[in-house]
């Protein structure tokens, strides 16, 4: 049996290829951008804040954060003040919502959601900070000292992650160093401020959670701080560097590190 080859004009092939490409892009955008965006957190003009989460199948949704009144938390080491918790109310299309009853004072705040007992991040807020093994979303209410935490239109310093050899500990280690604007070309000598984190922290703690570079940039620009070098070390003598930055790979962060008090 013989088969006759059918000729398909090139313009039809090109048209079909373009059509399929457009359909693919359209479906991809629909998957990425499908539905109305959920705005969260929404900071209102009076500094009240609305938190939203789309969870149509959830039974209970709560928000927990340091902007809420504290609650007592029992631990093996006794009772401590922990972040408060507030309930969200379900609205249209399965979007849950909570608005703070009072305006929030200027500050950097952290929070997360609890959905049916499971703690999750706010998918509408890409800004997050790790504190030891905890990850939370963050937002800033501007004004007062909180403006120091922002990136403002001022000269900016440089943040470097530097590896050095420690003969005492027998390993290479990592530190974070802030140098003020103009440091590289000034030819001047600068005072050095050594900044150590708290228990469980590392060389990333102050620069991320503590907003060191933003605060120094702003204070120096305002003439309220002398230009200086800030060295942020890793005080855990058993660590080369922060979790995920060592040759051990992406190990889980821990508070109970060996040699913690020898750093």
Regions found by a protein language model. Give the residues of each.
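Sec-dependent N-terminal signal peptides
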Residues: 13-23
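Non-catalytic cap/lid and distal C-terminal segments of serine-dependent acyl enzymes
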Residues: 43-263
